[in-house]
């Protein structure tokens, strides 16, 4: 459907599995279907593992988000031009859109990405590392952060080592580097390492389960767990609105 298919002063929107055009336009879809067809499951999980679904309904959620963005863009355009629009959002298209890194690697290098666990394909160290008691996410996204990390781990010589002194070199030699890092991390618990790393502004964090995530003081401070009310079941708690507008409070959905 074209722009002119909408009335001159209104907009219409359609979010569907495969959109309003193309050979699949009449077919139904669920989140799981587009995760598979969009390539997302092919890069999720660990090497040689079975196809792995992302832990949330990302196919549904991204389609909703892109639809909301499209509606806002159409309203803004109507305000300026007086013209309406038809917004066509495909769940499958949204999966392609969010795989920007993987698709860029294929289109530019003819490289077909594979699952890498928690590892990043082009930044290192940028993954989960085992500590004395659990796992720790470390995201040393540039050379400066890597030098700070080496200071914390008391391996300053590694920062200037010919195998690790640049991000490109670290990515090439990440298996060896991970062994060095985890050897040092074994001496303290995750919480202890986080305190030290946060002092140097090294991006890091624990891996929480849902209970720990919900009870995180940061989440409570941000009003991300709210009380709601339903006429049949009464009061209940749910996830809040991540969009904070400082001019308004965030009321519970009713």
Where are these regions (language model features)?
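Aromatic-enriched alpha-helical interface/lid elements that frame and gate functional surfaces
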Residues: 125-200, 204, 250
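Short, surface-exposed loop/helix-turn segments at secondary-structure junctions
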Residues: 106-113, 216-230
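Flexible, small-/acidic-enriched active-site or ligand-binding loops
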Residues: 233-250
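Glycine-rich phosphate-binding loop and adjacent beta-alpha segment
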Residues: 32, 227-231, 235-238
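Single conserved hydrophobic/aromatic residue that forms the stacking wall/gate
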Residues: 1-7, 11, 248-254
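Active-site-adjacent "lid/gating" segments in soluble enzymes
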Residues: 8, 13-136, 140
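Short acidic-hydrophobic surface loop/beta-edge motif
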Residues: 127-131, 226-231
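Conserved PLP cofactor-binding pocket of PLP-dependent enzymes
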Residues: 198-219
């Amino acid at each position: 459907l074209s722009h002119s298919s909408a009335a001159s002063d209104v907009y219409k929107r359609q979010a569907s599995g495969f959109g309003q055009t193309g050979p699949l336009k009449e077919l139904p879809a669920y989140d799981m279907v587009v995760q598979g067809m969009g390539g997302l499951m092919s890069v999720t999980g660990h090497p040689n593992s079975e196809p792995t679904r992302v832990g949330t309904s990302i196919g549904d959620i991204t389609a909703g988000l892109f639809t909301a963005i499209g509606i806002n863009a159409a309203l803004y355009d109507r305000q300026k031009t007086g013209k309406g629009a038809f917004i066509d959002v495909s769940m499958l298209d949204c999966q392609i859109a969010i795989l920007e890194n993987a698709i860029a690697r294929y289109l530019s290098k003819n490289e077909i990405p594979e699952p890498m666990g928690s590892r990043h394909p082009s930044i290192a160290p940028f993954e989960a590392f085992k500590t004395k008691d659990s796992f720790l996410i470390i995201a040393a996204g540039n050379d400066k952060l890597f030098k700070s990390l080496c200071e914390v781990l008391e391996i300053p010589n590694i920062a200037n080592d010919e195998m690790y002194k640049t991000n490109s070199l670290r990515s090439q030699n990440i298996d060896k580097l991970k062994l060095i890092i985890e050897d040092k991390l074994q001496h303290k618990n995750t919480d202890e390492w986080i305190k030290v790393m946060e002092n140097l502004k090294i991006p890091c964090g624990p891996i929480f389960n849902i209970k720990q995530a919900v009870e995180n003081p940061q989440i409570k401070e941000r009003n991300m767990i709210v009380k709601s009310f339903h006429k049949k079941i009464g009061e209940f708690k749910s996830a809040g609105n991540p969009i904070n507008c400082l001019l308004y409070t965030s009321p519970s959905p009713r």
